[in-house]
Amino acid sequence: MIGAPCVVDTRGTWHYRRKQMKKRVVVVGAGLCGSLLSTLLRNDFEVTIVEQGRTKRPLFNDVECKTGELNTSINRGEGLGGTSNYWHNALIELDDDDLEKAGIEPRGFAPYYAKAWSLFLAQAELDECARARDANRASVGGGTATVAHMVLPQTRHNMWKLANERYPGDSIKIVYGHAQKIAPGYVEVKGRNGVERLDADYVIASAGGLATPVLLARSLGQDDAFCAGYHDHPMAYIAKVKLRPDSRLKAASCTTTRSAEVRAGLTYKTAGLKTVIYLRPAIDMRLGSITGPARYILSDLRNDPFSPKKILMLLGNLEAVREAILFKTRQGFRGDYYSVLILGEQTPIKTRGIQLSPGKRPSLNWQVTAEELASYDRSVNAFFDEYASEIVERKALPSAEWTFRNAAHHSGTANQFVAAPGDTTPEFFRATGLPGTFVCDGSLLRAAGIANSGLTLVALGYRLADQMRSMA
């Protein structure tokens, strides 16, 4: 268990009875949302959290998917903290338009975004990032593109450890195993010693955008369900550019503060879909470093640092080595050469999602449609047109040769299991047909624009915790 030690104190019998009177919450999944929610609720409920395994390890074979490097890069994780064991949380808000598409009223949600920012950065650090944001918008804003504000903290946090540091309190029981089914009053968990029933007044499904819909479907007896509505942010390196020595794009691409990097994303909307463009440091105009499996080797090796194969790949991509040094030494981006990285918006469609089959692993279809590709291509051309005077030279891959990778934001797959009330009321989180069950992870998001979903999910965690305290 995690929390205050069991000692006899002046509270004595009263303290024991208070604990016995608490309602029981079972949280499935100890990743981003599950870790936060379990700590926020620990003093009001008797909290149990279910995590697949004790050992931190990536998951590569729990889902069938042949595209987008879904099963060759780390984007699902086992162990307390989930994928936060591997990834920095790049912090970016959904804009008002995207919040409304996601069923979230923007003004009422603003205080929860503020709480989410404060979980990761102190107020002085946030003020410094805000000054960089304003400078970026003054420098490169005002044209066709809107300027997205992304903050990448220097410190990578395991969410389980961070949440427990921020919100200590009563004990949390940890159960290791696979949640098999949610039923009225309990959760079935299969562990080393067989199937265990965990009594629950309330259940929070926070197993992640690929696992939560599978759990919900199987709990409802839908063993062959298709969980539609999946969307992510297809990402691809598509070009290299040489900028003018005095180009305003240089500072906006990366501003270094004492505790973070602030990166301005240039966002275009074409045919109803957004595309965001980020510039990353390069050495020259050769395209070899942004094609093939070595193009993301920096993040792949960071999460698997002892792989001989990946070490050799890194040594073959000096641009990745240089970028790592710039990040660690807080020098920002340097030089005239940059790679162009895009992330595209996907919207929920009926043919994209997770297919369940009895006795088999779930399979994911997340392909980029022809319409999406055409939209991204037009947005890239708009970027090159708008900033033509900043670019001395460019080499671009044709859109037919763009190789997309999944950005691991796995969203939208629980939409058929939850209502759409138009705001974050309890019904927004409540799983239909499973009394006392709530959903809080990427599977809940109906839209995400071009924003990494992590900050929004943390804000939703704070919102759900506020609502559940009234149920204690």
Placement of each model-derived feature along the sequence:
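Conserved redox-cofactor binding core of oxidoreductases
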Residues: 104-184, 401-403
